[in-house]
Amino acid sequence: MSSRQDKEKSVNVQVLLRCRPFSDDEVRSNAPQVITCNDYQREVAVTQTIAGKQIDRVFTFDKVFGPTAKQRDLYDQAIIPIVNEVLEGFNCTIFAYGQTGTGKTYTMEGECRRAKSGPKGQLPADAGVIPRAVKQIFDTLESQNTEYSVKVTFLELYNEEITDLLAPEEISKAALEERQKKPLPLMEDGKGGVLVRGLEEEIVTNASEIFSLLERGSAKRRTAETLLNKQSSRSHSLFSITIHIKEATPEGEELIKCGKLNLVDLAGSENISRSGAREGRAREAGEINKSLLTLGRVITALVEHLGHVPYRDSKLTRLLRDSLGGRTKTCIIATVSPSVHCLEETLSTLDYAHRAKSIKNRPEVNQKMMKSTLIKDLYGEIDRLKAEVYAAREKVGVYIPKDRYQQEENERKAMADQIEQMTTSLEANQKQINDLQEKYDSELQHSADLSKKLEATEKCLDHTSNLLSTTKEDLKQAQYNLKEKDYIISEQRKAENALIQQACLLRSDLEKSNRENAALYSKIARGDKLNAANRSVVNSFQADLASKLDILSTTLATSIDQQNKHLKSVENLCKSCVDSHDTATSEIKKKILASKALYMSHMEAFQNVVLLHKANSNSTLEDISSLSAASCCSLDQLLACVEGEAQKIFGDIQNLLADHRSEVAHFTQELRESFRISLDRTKDMSSFILGLFDKYVEETSKLQSHSNHTHEAQVKSLEDFQKAYEEQSKSEEQKLLADITSLVSKHVTRQRELVGGRLNSLGDAARGNKAFLDEHTSAMEVVTKDAKRKWEMFAEQAENDCKVGSNFSAAKHCRMETILQECACTVDTAAQQWKASHATVNDLCRKQIAEVEALVRSAIETNEQHEAEIASSRATAEEHASNSSKDLLQDVDNMLQEARNSSSRVVSTVEAHLGESQHLQESHSSHTAGINTHADNAFQSSYKDYEPTGETPVRSEPEVPSKDAIESLRAMPMESLMDEFRENHPYEPSKDRRPSLIPRSPLATINN
């Protein structure tokens, strides 16, 4: 309970923000403005650029004063209520916080001197918080016509050392140096606060004295010029005003009401690199920043409610301990600069000021003291001091150090002044008492005169008293009835408010349900849109795939027809080559047989001539028969030898031609077999490609059927879902009219279950569809890769077959050339042998002629005739042999040329077929790659999965009040409420008291 009361009494620290206008240097440099103040909305916006982006940070304070705000505006709106609270007996603190050069001292002090021309000593427009607060205090005290006393202190905190700015100037220089060496100590007062021992308290009686003291102390403050401020405060200052106001109670007792106002001007935090501080100034800036950093840590600890608050880390925080988290009302004036050059310090000031808003103080009114008690305490203090003085003089007491003795002497001096003041006040009070006694005597005389009149009115008073008692009883009864009615009305209002609150909760739950239904409908619409887009992607992919497959099928069919044509042309070429070879061989055979027959006829004719010559020569050459017989035998042997050689040559030629024919037939057979194998492979490849197309068509039909089936299933599912949702909505709407409380939750739950189940089924169907499409797509990719591999193998095999056929043809061509060369060599050998035989015959003839020249002179004519016939026969035979050899060589050359032409035609046909096969392979590869790319684009880029947007509501169970809870909100009947009120507040009739007959004392005049 006590902690709750403390929380109720706690008050947040009031934080004001003031932004100064641009200085002359900033105006000349055209510095950008980063601070925007909104006085009406109490907001401050800071514009900063981070990573090329402009970011605005907005801070909210209790009051905001822009660059155009005047000193009077700030004081009238924010400081006047604080000064009034000081006059009510509170301790209040006002301090300025911010960077150096932002106008803290100007805000707190301003222009301290009063205007000389004003009839009432009005302050100048630039006067700050301190002079305006002083003027308000004295104006208020003087207007109240009360006795008061005002004391002021003014201290400076420089480098963690406290200096009294109101120390008397007549102190000797040695004493002043000694005091400066020994700064004033800071001590605990035992009540959670601190006090400075030896601090001068100046008693002032009017505002002019305070202004003079303020000017004197401000002149002693340490200031210096920096790059940021021409007159920068190098220390913190604390100006305290303590007010004692005497009040009189109705009982005649006098009380002393005490209030204290602390006005703090903090030194500004500064960046040494920008302020240009060096050596001593840098040390000053370091101490200032250290104390302000400790102040920031204290603010952070108070805001975060840490167990330890570092008050003792700095004398500044020790002095402000009661103002931050204590029993004092605190107001912080944060001052900032609008320039971009001070953006970092401005953000730091705004952050600390914004955090300081969360500090909670527990202000308490200072306890009022009775004047007699205060005088008694002062007398006791005087007696104690006298005893100490006596002990010190008689040397029977405790000795203390010299500095403490001086401090106590100063304190005693102050106490003596206070006692003297109190004595003066006591004499004035005694004089006032005497005056009041005289007035009292005169009033007694006057009351004696009035007593006679009082006796006359007492009789009337008795009657009036009786009437008044009756009226009071009636009034009391009426007031009791009014209280009873008020109690009933309040209870009914409570019940009505509870019912309204419950209805609002139900309405918010219903609105939330409607929003969630809208989100679910939007999600279903997104799913339908995504499915439609995917269906269009699949349909377009199916159409493109069918068109590309048709193109590929047409290309392959054309290629197969071209290959069949090429194979037929090659087969025709082979057949024509074989036929030409057969024709040439038969012609050569005929020519050889004709040559042989001609040769045999010539030989027979020659033999006939020889036999005829022999028969004719028998009669004339009987004497040389032996020699002729020998010559004939030699000639017969020679002819037989020549005939054997000729038969042998003709046999060799026939054997060579037979071998050549068999080799040509074998070559033709092998070439046919090679082309047959190539044709079979082409047919296999064609059948494989046709099967591949059949598989593509089958996969496409499967995809089409599955897509149609999936679409139909989804459409049917959505129709079922729509019907079920409409039916359930109608039934739920009818039921909602009966019992709105319980069925709202059931309605929401059923809708969520129904929508969740349908969405799950749709999600499963979409995932199954995607898996099916992925499976068939992968199958199509496998089939395409297999077809590509088969086609590459086929192309490689066809190329190898072409190379083998070409090599085989070249080898057979070389073999035929070799055989023909051998045949030509054989013919040349036969001709040479024939010439050799002819020469041998001529030699034998010449020998025979030489031997038988004497014997055949008689038959010269006959021999010459026979020789001429033989020569003509020989010439004819030689001519026929030469013509036959030439014809045979010409036929062999023609056959060789025809074989070469046929081989070149076959090679060109095979090369053309190979080029078309390679072109077909490249075209098929490009079409296959295009199909794969299109499939990847269709199923990886265009085909999209459902992506959650985060807008689908999370499933949650609504809080449904029970019937008992709703019934408990119903207001009780009026009779029950009246009985309850009468039971808790029973009516007590007033006792019938008779009016007193004792004469009343006369009234004393309180104020004259």
From Swiss-Prot:
Intracellular or extracellular location(s): Cytoplasm, Cytoskeleton; Cytoplasm, Cytoskeleton, Spindle
Stretches assigned to coiled coil: 402-459
PROSITE patterns: KINESIN_MOTOR_1, KINESIN_MOTOR_2
Residues binding ATP, per UniProt: 98-105
GO cellular component assignments: cytoplasm; mitotic spindle; spindle microtubule
Free-text function comment from the UniProt entry: Responsible for microtubule translocation. May be important for the organization of phragmoplast-specific arrays of microtubules. Plays an essential role in stabilizing the mitotic spindle. Required during mitotic cytokinesis.
Cysteines joined through disulfide linkages: none
Residues covered by region (Disordered): 910-931, 943-962, 975-1008
Family: Belongs to the TRAFAC class myosin-kinesin ATPase superfamily. Kinesin family. KIN-5/BimC subfamily.
Alphabetical UniProt keywords: ATP-binding, Coiled coil, Cytoplasm, Cytoskeleton, Microtubule, Motor protein, Nucleotide-binding
Main location: cytoplasm
One Gene Ontology term from the biological process aspect of the record: mitotic spindle assembly
Sequence ranges of Basic and acidic residues compositional bias: 913-925, 979-995
Any GO molecular function: plus-end-directed microtubule motor activity
Name of the protein: Kinesin-like protein KIN-5C
Domain spans labelled Kinesin motor: 12-359
Cross-referenced InterPro entries: KIF11-like, KIF11-like_kin_motor_dom, Kinesin_motor_CS, Kinesin_motor_dom, Kinesin_motor_dom_sf, P-loop_NTPase
Acetylation recorded as keyword: no
